[in-house]
Structure formats: structure tokens, C-alpha cells
Amino acid sequence: MNLTNKLCLIAAGTAALAAIPAAASAKEGPYIGLSGGVALPNDSNNSGAFDATVPATPDFGAIPADTSLGWKTEFDTGYAINGQVGYAFDNGFRVELEGAYTRYGVDRHSGLTVGGANIDGVDVAVLTRGAPAAGNPTVGAVIADGQGRVSNFGLFGNVFYDINTGSSFKPFVGAGIGYQWADVRFEPSGVDVADANDGGFAYQLMAGASVELSERAELFGQYTWRDRTDTATVPLNLLPANLGVETGQSIVSAGVRIKFGQ
């Protein structure tokens, strides 16, 4: 699903929620929350281009500036930590400011292409500009040994609607927009390929349910889809190139909210 379709779903969902009668038992007041869980990142189809010409050597031709490059990165399951400060209205709506952090490791890279040609089977010297040798590993063998990680930190403004069920159990849906920084470190086979960060606008869609423990506390579980509106663009250290890294992720979390003045 592309960004336009997701934004349309947000708008449609907001309109539908506005038509739901307000929960008679909803109480108004501020709250704070803390949650944690697992981050399930999508694979990243990294893409970029050389920003300078790689000179020719006796064994390999030059790689001109603006030549495309890319590869696929698969990630491990990671973790998520979130903190919220919000305000609940008596009509079922809530608004909140959320700080969100996720971190996950790199499993493997594969399918490195330069100018559209896959070079996984080529001597790694094509990238290091060293001399090819029978004992050298291939590009594919070097990048298959993942190593590295991606950390994301975001600040979001969220809007939720708690659905009144007439009990202490309340399903909810929500959406948020904000800004997210991605810190990308790629070190396949211990080679320092990338270590940089980049920020950009981001959005998230949420659904879950809460259960009241008391008048002041409630437990909640939540699913979140979070992504940026663009890729995280990071400069490469091994090559004179920039790479766009995708940061879309599902997050499954559980936490507690403490209510004040309600």
C-alpha cells in the first residue's frame, strides 16, 4: 500500500470515528504512559547513486558519477520503547505527544547492483579497488555476513479514539504524524560501509485495547505501523555514494497509562 492510500485510510477512519456517539462514561483529564515491545522491521530495498567517479584500475573499469547502486537488507526482530504524555476528553478522543525509540540488528545483505547489474558473484576487489585474487571472497559472500544495526528515534503528535463498550475494556484506534531520525550502521563482515544518521517526516497508524485496573491506571496493548515519508539517506564510507534506507516497521507493544484529575 502506497503513502497516498494510507493517508486516505487515515482520513476515512477519522471521518468514521467522528460519527460514533461519544462515550457517556468517558472521563476527562491528563495522563502519562510508558510501553515497550518488539519491533518487526520490513526488509529494506536500499537504493542510491555514486556522487563521484570511482577511478579505473588495471583490473576494473571506472564507475561514473550518478551510476545507480542498491541492495536488499534483511533485519532481525528488535525492540521498542515508547513514552507518552496526553489528554483524554470526555467524548472518547485523546491527544498525546509520544517519544518513540526502536532498535534492530542487520541479518544479511544481498543482491548488490551497480548500474543495474548484479555483482554478488564478482571478486570483492571490484569495490575495494584492490587486485583480484583466487583467495578473495565474492561481493555476495562479504555482504551476506550482515552485522550492523538501525536505531530510530521519533517524536509524534497522536490522536486516538477510545470506543465505549460499557465495560473496563476499551478498543481504540489512532494515527500520528511527526519527525523521525534513523541512525544506520552497516558493517558486513566487519567492513565499515555506512555509519550515519538522517531525519525526516514520519507517520504512524495504531490500533489496540486497554483495560482499567483502577480509576487512575490502565493496561494497554497496541499494534503500530510506523514509517517515514521518505527514505533515510546516508553517505557510504566504503564508496563515494549515498544510499536510501527504508525504515518501515510494525511494532507490537504493551504498557500502562496513569491518569490524573479524572
Where are these regions (language model features)?
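Gram-negative (and chloroplast) outer-membrane scaffold detector with strong preference
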Residues: 27-29, 38-42, 84-187, 247-262
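Short glycine/proline- and aromatic-enriched beta-strand/turn motifs that initiate or cap beta-hairpins
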Residues: 22-87, 184, 257-262
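Cleavable N-terminal export/targeting peptides
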Residues: 1-28, 261-262
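Short sequence motifs at beta-strands and strand-loop junctions characteristic
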Residues: 65, 69-80, 147-154, 197-202, ...
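C-terminal or late-domain output modules
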Residues: 164-261
